[in-house]
Amino acid sequence: EIVTSLVADKNDNLCLYGATGSSDFPTTSGCFDNTFNGGQFLHYPQNGTLFSNGTDIYVAKFNALGSTLMASTYLGGSENDGVNNNINTSLYDSLMFNYGDQFRGEIQVDINDDIYIASSTKSPDFPTVNALDGVLNGNQDAILVKLNTTLTSIVYSTYIGGDNKDCGNALTLDDSLNVYLTGGTCSNNFYTTPGSYKPTYTGGRTDGYICKIKYDGSSILNSTFIGTVNYDQSYFIQLDNNKDVYIFGQTQGSMPVTAGVYSKINSRQFIQKLNNQLDTLLASTIIGNSNGQINISPSAFSVDCAGNIYLSGWGGNILVGSSSVVNMPITANAIQSTTDGHNFYLMVLGPNMSSLLFGSYFGGVQSWEHVDGGTSRFDKRGIIYQSVCAGCANNDDFPVTPGAWPTSLYGSNTNQSSNCNNGVFKIDFQLNSALASI
């Protein structure tokens, strides 16, 4: 099993979304689907992940103490679901660009504790209910699913895509429960709305996209491509208090840099801000170390109530192109100002991307920190909760804090694995200090 994304509802119940290859995955009575649907053999040798019988999506909910499985269901069709499937023989294809990109997607909850999933599928019979599009359009489509809080029924479920490959990387909601979906597409006929910011495919092997979908799933209100003539992909999406739309992604092209923003020339990570109708670019910047290469794989993104923009990502030789985080922008208030080139990078920009408020590395001096996919989160106070593959190659150099979770079977300040161990850090950027790390 793979855990791709977590979120807590208003009662602090923990909701999980991921992929499973198990026919005995625990489900609860009356759930939407208690049967494993399976798919094609799938093996990712670069991280050892093997699904002999293919994959389904699973969605599960635990109580706030983690002591009770409140609800759990399968979600899938006859082919692989819940993975951004690499269909080429090479390690990286057009949508699975970074190490770990096969396990992208996101889970969110609304004010009623209904559950939303952004993901990808290759199944022509994925369960669609009240669908915008009930047909698999290409080799792989993005999917958007809304389930009720008990996971007993689908409120709506739809394919989103064109005649090539598409993936769903992230979603967010506004106060009216309209859904904003983002990801990557190789389809030049991906649906966009007339008058949108970029209504036509811009070229290259992949574009990003943003779709705004009506609260009841009945229509696409606004939709646009995001991209250049080269590779581009959007990994995260957020809204500010004005419902302007922000995305965080990667590019190998020349993304626009608007007046008055903080930027680093010849960099390959981008942040863009569009109006709610997705027809106007309000601000755009590129950030990185100016070496012309992609430096980080995005892992978390947020916009706080004041309009400050937070991001997290990791870089190093595991990434395509032997990337490095050396010479990323670092501020005087950094938690860690030096790097071995294979660490996490954390950044905060001021409103409208106008200034660099915070830039720091986080990680060990020898090991190559990374993630094997999935998402982590900031809260609206600007605190990050990040899970990490730490201490890789049996190192003990991941930064840990005094009094962290007890040094026992369940937590340690040393790496008890022959390779990587799970590390977790929590950082409040307003305090400029690590609050907890285990």
Short names for language-model regions:
Residues 1-438:
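A sequence-level/structural motif corresponding to short, flexible coil/turn segments enriched
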